[in-house]
Amino acid sequence: MDKRILVRLAIYPIAYVLWGGLMWYSQIITPLDVTNLLLKLPLCNKEFYIFLQSLPNIVIEFFKIIYLYGFSSMIIGGIAYYLFIKRDFLKSDIILIDLALGWLFAGLIYTFVVVKSPFQVGVAKDLINMHYFWIFTKPTYEIPSLHTAYSFLLALHFKDEKPLNYIYFALAILIPISTLIMGMHWIVDVITGVLYGYIIYKFPKTIHIKISKALDFLAGHIKPCILCGKCKERETHEK
C-alpha cells in the first residue's frame, strides 16, 4: 500500500480523537445562555416541533437513519473516496482539515455563547437518545449546526464529482431537516450552519497545503528541500 495512505490512516484517527476532545475547552468558562432570545423567533416554538414530530412513523424513522448514519457516511465516505479511489491525497487532507477548523472556530462560539436544544427546553422530544453522543458533543452546541455546516461543506467539495454530487447535495438537504425532526436543532441553527459551511469551504487553503506536504514528507514522498519551495527541484517534482 502507498505509504502516503498509511501515514494518513495513522494520522486521521488521531486527528479525530483530538477533534472530539476539543469539546472540553468549552468548559473553561461559563457561557452566556441566549436560549430565551431565540424562543422569540419564528418557527422556534412548540407548535412547529409538534407538527414535525407528528409526521408518519415511517418518515420519522427515515430521518432518524439520515441523522445517525447519513452524516457519518458523508464524512467517512468523502475522505475515503479521495484517499482510496481518487488517490487525491491533497483533497482528502483539505476535507479533514476543513472539518477540524470548522470545529475549532465553532468551539470558540460554543465557549462563550450557548443555546439549549429544542428537546432540552421542552419544545421538542429527543427522538434519538442524545445522551449516547455526549462524549463528542453536547446539546448546547447549537449555533451554528455542525451537522448542517459539514453536510453542506462536503456537498461543496463534491460538486464536480458526478454522479456522487447528487447524493451529497441530497444529503446536505436531508440532514438539516433530520436535525429539526429529531428535536436536536432550531431553524436558526440550520440557517447559520449553511452560512458557516460556506465560509469554511472558502477559507484560504494555505495551512491545508502545508499540512498535506508535511504528511507526504512523513511518507517519504518528497524531500526536505521541497518543503521550502525555493529550489527548482520542487518544480520538476510537481510536474
UniProtKB/Swiss-Prot annotation:
Keyword presence, Transmembrane: yes
InterPro entries: Aur1/Ipt1, P_Acid_Pase_2/haloperoxi_sf, P_Acid_Pase_2/haloperoxidase
Keyword vocabulary terms for this entry: Cell membrane, Membrane, Transmembrane, Transmembrane helix
Primary site of residence: membrane
Membrane topology reported for the UniProt record: Multi-pass membrane protein
GO CC entries: plasma membrane
This protein's record includes keyword Ribonucleoprotein: no
Subcellular location: Cell membrane
SUPFAM superfamilies, A to Z: Acid phosphatase/Vanadium-dependent haloperoxidase
Membrane spanning stretches: 9-29, 65-85, 94-114, 167-187
Protein name, as recorded: Uncharacterized protein MJ0662
Species in which this protein is naturally found: Methanocaldococcus jannaschii (strain ATCC 43067 / DSM 2661 / JAL-1 / JCM 10045 / NBRC 100440)
